[in-house]
């Protein structure tokens, strides 16, 4: 190899090193997804979202109307619209569904039979709603740290999720504020579903 070619090769390698070290540019922006978070009052929606945002638990106040939180993850930002779960609020939930790309449904796995039945009815309505039925769902069986908590298998059977959600993208996960790692993993799985739906839309 001639001296000229050797010099050119070294110059090109120097250029590549320079590009790698000095010209990286800003990191690519994380994708953002707009989600709606629903569930009965007392299910723990606000506390779970506040934990993910590293907010002090002392400042947590139950949501009466709606609130929006930007929940950051390494590979995405979730803009979560949390809706209050009181009786007089739930009838207005559907007004806030438009534009959602995914759904988080939080239930109290240690609740009374009456409340659990109400939660089941609300989840069934959400799964079948025209604006939500094609979206990924993350269903969180919260308060697993309580003695009366029902298992994920019990929740799945009682809520009739297998037949009702067949063909849909959904995840049912246990959670509690005592196990933040499992909570974060649940949201990571939801992000994977959101990304899959994005990729399918691009291919179409």
From Swiss-Prot:
Record key words, sorted: GTP-binding, Nucleotide-binding
GO molecular function terms listed in the Swiss-Prot or TrEMBL record: GTP binding; GTPase activity
Name of one Pfam family that matches: Arf
Residues annotated to bind GTP: 39-46, 82-86, 142-145
Top-level taxon: Eukaryota
InterPro entries: ARL15, P-loop_NTPase, Small_GTPase_ARF/SAR
Family that this chain belongs to: Belongs to the small GTPase superfamily. Arf family.
Name of the molecule in the record: ADP-ribosylation factor-like protein 15
Upper classification of the organism: Eukaryota, Metazoa, Chordata, Craniata, Vertebrata
